[in-house]
């Protein structure tokens, strides 16, 4: 066994703040080294008992709110703070593997998953890590040609020395305003990814930054210069937002020097993400769509704008709002939504934004919202779960919320 070094400095004492999946991956990795003491702070009361000056390094889980007491104290030790991705980078930087980082408010999970899928379909060894669910250090022993990393603004705030071969920002809209002073601060946290990337681009249709290389969207298809490359109907996806996601993937592959025509064939096979605008079933003429991964206002707006051309959506909305500005969805609600059922911890907060702009009802929980929606829905209408909120008031995560929705649809079908 060997001692643990970071930036050529021997580390003998490390504090781990937070012990979720990321913290556990760091702890498991460090178990391979000798001569290092690791202390773990799992809650506020434990944290205040540690002398931060006494540690060589401090790893912080992305879920730790650095803007709130007692964790504000960490801001004085920025040079000591490292993320799990910094540690991962230290141990792969001398290999030939290429690293790609993608951040954004909406679309990043689809982009990284599609990129990883295409790379594998083209015959490369690719790993997909980061905010999407698999901590980078869990893959440290694998051999790979490409490492695709989904990064959140919280993770970027913790970066120390990582250098990605390519960084990309897509579609930044207000989110996590419970962790940032305002939207500008949140947006800047995303843009900071450029500081840790050798090559970098932004594709943000919401803020008018449409770097697209030679690509453009015309009547539901992607063109390169004047040549049509791909029509949305040739894919297993739907909606203009997915054409935008594909353009980002094509730009990533372009910058990696890969064959775009071969990539197009791979993209046609990509089935999309679970819990992201997935049609569950049609029951009694009503289509039920699971977009549980829509955890902020921007994501729900994208779903509303892509699913239909009629005012035939019954929307299930609610959970933990994270300070979101629900007034931004009023235009889409007016155009596409027949009725809204609002549920969850912040239902009154959401109501304060949309009251007077649409028909709605407050519900106790998602199950009640579903039951009322299924009773109201007529043939050729859509019941859409796109909550625009986090789920942890009622569920363990967006995946469980989506699974519960799917089970409710299955139960409804059995009764029909």
UniProtKB/Swiss-Prot annotation:
Coiled coil stretches, renumbered: none
Chief location category: cytoplasm
Gene symbol of the encoding locus: murD
Gene Ontology CC: one annotated term: cytoplasm
Keyword line: ATP-binding, Cell cycle, Cell division, Cell shape, Cell wall biogenesis/degradation, Cytoplasm, Ligase, Nucleotide-binding, Peptidoglycan synthesis
SUPFAM superfamilies, alphabetized: MurD-like peptide ligases, catalytic domain, MurD-like peptide ligases, peptide-binding domain
Enzyme Commission number(s): 6.3.2.9
Kinase recorded as keyword: no
Annotated protein name in UniProt: UDP-N-acetylmuramoylalanine--D-glutamate ligase
Single GO BP term: peptidoglycan biosynthetic process
Catalysis: reaction(s): UDP-N-acetyl-alpha-D-muramoyl-L-alanine + D-glutamate + ATP = UDP-N-acetyl-alpha-D-muramoyl-L-alanyl-D-glutamate + ADP + phosphate + H(+)
Alphabetical list of HAMAP family matching this protein: MurD
Function: Cell wall formation. Catalyzes the addition of glutamate to the nucleotide precursor UDP-N-acetylmuramoyl-L-alanine (UMA).
């Amino acid at each position: 066994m060997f001692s643990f070094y970071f930036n050529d400095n021997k580390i003998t004492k490390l504090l781990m703040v937070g012990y979720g999946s990321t913290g556990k991956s760091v702890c498991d990795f460090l178990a391979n080294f000798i001569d290092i003491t690791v202390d773990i702070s799992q809650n506020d009361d434990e944290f205040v008992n540690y002398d931060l000056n006494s540690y060589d390094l401090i790893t912080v889980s992305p879920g730790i709110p650095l803007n709130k007491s007692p964790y504000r104290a960490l801001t004085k030790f920025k040079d000591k703070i490292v993320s799990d991705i910094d540690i991962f980078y230290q141990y792969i930087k001398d290999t030939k593997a290429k690293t790609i980082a993608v951040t954004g408010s909406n679309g990043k999970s689809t982009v990284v998953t599609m990129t990883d899928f295409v790379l594998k379909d083209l015959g490369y060894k690719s790993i997909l890590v980061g905010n999407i669910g698999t901590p980078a250090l869990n893959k440290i022993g694998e051999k790979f040609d490409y490492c695709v990393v989904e990064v959140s603004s919280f993770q970027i705030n913790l970066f120390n020395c990582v250098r990605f071969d390519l960084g990309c920002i897509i579609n930044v809209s207000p989110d996590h305003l419970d962790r940032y002073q305002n939207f500008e601060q949140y947006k800047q946290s995303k843009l900071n990814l450029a500081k840790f990337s050798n090559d970098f681009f932004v594709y943000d249709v919401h803020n008018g930054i449409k770097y697209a290389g030679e690509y453009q969207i015309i009547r539901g298809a992607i063109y390169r210069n004047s040549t049509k490359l791909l029509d949305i109907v040739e894919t297993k996806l739907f909606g203009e937002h997915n054409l935008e996601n594909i353009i980002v993937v094509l730009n990533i592959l372009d910058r990696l020097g890969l064959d775009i025509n071969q990539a197009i064939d791979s993209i046609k096979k990509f089935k999309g993400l679970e819990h992201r605008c997935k049609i569950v079933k049609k029951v009694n003429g009503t289509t039920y769509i699971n977009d549980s991964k829509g955890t902020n206002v921007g994501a729900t707006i994208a779903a509303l704008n892509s699913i239909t051309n009629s005012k035939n959506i019954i929307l299930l909305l609610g959970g933990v709002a994270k300070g979101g500005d629900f007034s931004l969805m009023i235009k889409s609600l007016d155009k596409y939504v027949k009725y809204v059922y609002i549920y969850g911890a912040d239902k009154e907060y959401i109501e304060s934004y949309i009251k007077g702009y649409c028909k709605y009802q407050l519900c106790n929980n998602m199950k009640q919202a579903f039951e009322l929606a299924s009773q109201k829905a007529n043939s050729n209408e859509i019941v859409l779960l796109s909550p625009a909120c986090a789920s942890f008031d009622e569920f363990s995560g967006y995946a469980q919320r989506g699974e519960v929705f799917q089970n409710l649809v299955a139960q409804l079908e059995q009764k029909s």
